[in-house]
From Swiss-Prot:
The gene is psaD. The keyword Nucleotidyltransferase does not apply. One of its GO terms (cellular component) is photosystem I reaction center. Belongs to the PsaD family. This is Photosystem I reaction center subunit II. It is a peripheral membrane protein. One of its GO terms (biological process) is photosynthesis. The keyword Cell membrane does not apply. It comes from the Eukaryota. InterPro entries: PsaD, PsaD_sf. It is found in: Plastid, Chloroplast thylakoid membrane. PsaD can form complexes with ferredoxin and ferredoxin-oxidoreductase in photosystem I (PS I) reaction center. Gene3D superfamilies: Photosystem I PsaD, reaction center subunit II. Its main location: plastid.
Length: 141
C-alpha cells in the first residue's frame, strides 16, 4: 500500500456508534487507518462493539490515534495483517501520514534507524552497582 490515502476506499461494516467521538473530530482532526483484509471477518472495534472487515482494502475513521494503534495491534496479532497505515486527517482535507513513519514498524530492525540508549553487551555483563557506588560513574555508563 502506498503512503497516500484513497478516501474512496470502502469502510468496514459497523452497526454501532462511536459515542459521538467522530462528531467532535470533524471540527478538530480525525485519524484514519487503512489495511488490506484477507477475507471478510469480524473484529473488535476500539470504541466498543464489532465490525466486519471487507475482503481487500479497508478504511476506518477513528477519533484518536491510540484507537488506531490498538486496532493495528489487533490486526497484526489476530489476523496476521501487517500492512496497516495510520493517517491524520484535518478538517480542511489535508492528510498527514503518521505510522509507520519510515516504513518499518518500531519493533522491527531497520538498517537506517539509529539506535538510541543501546549497550553493546548482554544484561549479564552489566557492572555490579556496588562497584560504582562511591565513584563518579553511573551504573549505565
Amino acid at each position: 500500500m502506498p503512503d497516500t490515502i484513497n478516501l474512496n476506499m470502502p469502510s468496514p461494516t459497523f452497526g454501532g456508534s462511536t459515542g459521538g467521538w467522530l462528531r467532535a473530530a470533524e471540527v478538530e482532526e480525525k485519524y484514519a487507518i487503512t489495511w488490506t483484509g484477507k477475507n471478510e471477518s469480524k473484529f473488535e472495534m476500539p470504541t466498543g462493539g464489532t465490525a466486519t472487515m471487507r475482503d481487500g482494502e479497508n478504511l476506518l475513521y477513528l477519533a484518536k490515534k491510540e484507537q488506531c494503534l490498538a486496532l493495528g495491534t489487533q490486526l497484526k496479532g489476530k489476523f496476521k495483517i501487517s500492512d496497516y497505515k495510520i493517517y491524520r486527517v484535518f478538517p480542511n482535507g489535508e492528510v498527514q501520514y503518521l505510522h509507520p513513519k519510515d516504513g518499518v514498524f518500531p519493533e522491527k530492525v531497520n538498517a537506517g534507524r539509529a539506535s538510541i540508549n543501546s549497550v553493546d553487551h548482554s544484561i549479564g555483563k552489566n557492572v555490579n552497582p556496588i562497584n560504582v557506588k562511591f565513584t563518579n560513574k553511573a551504573t549505565y555508563d
